[in-house]
Amino acid sequence: VFIAGDAAHLMPPFMGQGMCAGIRDVSNLSWKIIHCVKKTHNEKILNSFQKERFSNVKEYIETTMKMGEFINAMRSYKISNTISDQSNGSKTMKSIKPELGPGLGSTLDKNRGRIFPKFNISKSKSFDELFSFEPILIVSKKLKLKKMSNKIKIVKESSYKELTKILKKFNADAILVRPDRFILQTF
């Protein structure tokens, strides 16, 4: 039995992240369950769910609680470390992008567990929509791949100009992206 979303963690309402966290929970679980049903992965892969999602959701909950303090105008000194001054004098909250906790992939890879950037490939379609719930391997122009498994989609850097920037951002020649769009490994 797996518990996901608000059944697993009650999210304060201030950032609208309760349903988002639930969707990320289900996204994390669904591709793993699909592979277990198809017998392409051992059921032990499901053990990574709680480890991976805990720290990610925890950071959202903590930030949402700080946002609640801000919204409720509680003592401003409590939240001063989460607010930054802008050049125009306005104040903004720092954005968060929590990584997955330990689970699948090498924890020695500093990019493992980070969310893969989203970008549009046309006015009406995003890169994510092209590869729904499929693992993808993004490879740079430098790499010459021979035959790979047909279970993973290979996307060449030259296919989309945005991939050049992304490979550079992660200092990688290849990025293995999980079906839930978190980075499994960079090479």
Give, region by region, the residue ranges found by the protein language model.
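Active-site-proximal cofactor/substrate-binding loop regions of enzyme domains
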Residues: 1-47
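Helical substrate-recognition/capping region of FAD-dependent monooxygenase/halogenase enzymes
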Residues: 35-187
